[in-house]
Every structure is written in C-alpha cells, then in structure tokens.
Amino acid sequence: PARAALADAVAATAWTLKRPEARGIDPERVFVGGMSAGAWLAAMTGMDRSYLAAYGIDSRKLAGLLLVSGQMTTHFQLKIDLHYPQSQFEPVIDRYAPLGHLSPELPPILLVTGESGLDMPGGPEENALMAAGLAALGHPLVRCFHIAGADHGGAFDRCEPFLTDFIAEASEARR
C-alpha cells in the first residue's frame, strides 16, 4: 500500500503540473505538502527526482515542499509492506527515505513537527537532521520548527502560521 500511495501522490502532482494553463494554475507557484504519511509522500515526490521525471517534470521547479510531522527515514508502513527486518521506529535510510535524497538543488523545504517526546518517536529529530544536512550542503531555503507542547496531531493543528510565512518567504525568494 505505501508504494501505491507514493505512485498516486506522484501521479496527482504530475496531473496538476501538466497543462497548467488548462487548470488555471501558475506552475511556478505549486507547493507540495502533507502531514504525517502525507508529508513522507510529499517529500519523496519532491526530493527523489526520478518520480516526477518519469512524467517529464523537473521536481526542482516546485515552489516548495511543506512537510508537517513527516517521517524522513523510510516510512514504517513501507518497511512493513516490503518485509524489512527493522522495527517500526528503527531508522532506515535507503532509496525510500527523504534523507537519502538530500541536495542543495531541491526546492525550498519547510519542516514542522511537534515537540520531541510528544510527536512520533524520533520524528522531530529526523526532521532536524534533514534540515541540518540540507543546510550543510548549501541548500538555499530550508526551515525547521518544533512546536513546543504539540504532539503529532497538534503539530498539524498549529502549523498554519509556519506554512503562511514560509510560502511568502519561498515565493519572494523565487522572484
């Protein structure tokens, strides 16, 4: 199911970006995002360039990735589906991990999580590692926020100001 969900996310993004004039959208202003498993799907869609390239789309053209409480290692559901020997929260960084696709050429990236110990186990730390890795590689626009007192769902409930500010910042940076 996780690989099928990823294929669906990529196909939906490609559909949105194909013939943008017919859909009334500016392809330069498309952000891809999600929460929890949706953040993993969005990250993989935008970070592993091969997925959108299969549709003739350069993922670097996305306006940004908006990732809320996402798993930046290989998603635990995919590990179950593919019979990985690792436990649910044991980190795996392979071709199915956003952390395995770090590059300074990625679109702008926002990472928002709940507080460590309240959000998913290891989630805030995985997101911090991704932000640090991208910054070390010279990525021009990555932001990472951990919302104090927020659990996994609470991060979503309280992420709107971070999303709004980041979209404005990323849009301004593209000009």
Feature annotation, model-predicted:
Residues 11-80, 93-94:
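Primarily recognizes the serine-hydrolase "nucleophile elbow" in alpha/beta-hydrolase
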Residues 56-78, 89-128, 132:
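The feature captures the conserved acid-bearing segment of alpha/beta-hydrolase catalytic domains
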Residues 1, 53, 118-121, 153-154:
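A generic structural signal for short coil/turn motifs at secondary-structure boundaries
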Residues 112, 124, 128-131, 135-175:
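C-terminal catalytic histidine-bearing segment of alpha/beta-hydrolase fold enzymes
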Residues 27, 60, 104, 136-139:
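Short, well-ordered coil/turn elements that cap or connect secondary structure elements
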Residues 30, 109, 142:
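Short, conserved active-site loop motifs that form the nucleotide-linked donor/cofactor pocket
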Residues 1-7:
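Cap/lid segment of the alpha/beta-hydrolase catalytic domain
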